[in-house]
């Protein structure tokens, strides 16, 4: 929403006065507890697209509202904590999305903190949720000290300039090819070699990208970044808008809450 101009601070639910759709947790209990207890719709425009975000409660005590709201969704964005991985409530919400054959886009969040190995997180998605992942971008760095991402589709590196703004504005970035001498120098030889090894492993052993499988909920495009610092957010937003299907008529099906 920061990129669409609907809010002026990443991680904040307080929007500009002119952006009435930018307020999410508006109830007093939500402000006090710092969680959503009811669903809300957030709307913003970006690059000729109008995006409607269905912001649903993540806490299991309010899961019924979340299940109902998912019936109106055309795509789902599954947020994974880089340190915690797949959590119990995530599994329940995934089951509902998978049952509806919703395209699921996965964003591994909080790379500004210590987290697990990206390959381990990919393996957990397959083992716990039964869905294969295709990394659209790949993080460059280690343990909360990430420098940028490698776009596997564009075959391009994007390095971010950390200005200590803590999400108050869009991060500046520098882009270049994998063999760009300036990019290699900025990364350092060790990080560059690690990135090349990761890319080779993904290309040799990873899944092929298939939009049919994505639309059937069998393959999830995978992204890495930090929503709080805007690390990797722009590339996710633009690729999501490119790949996500247009709204379609909905068919009614009965879904019981998973146990």
Regions found by a protein language model. Give the residues of each.
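P-loop NTPase switch module centered on the Walker A-proximal segment
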Residues: 1-80, 86, 135, 177-180
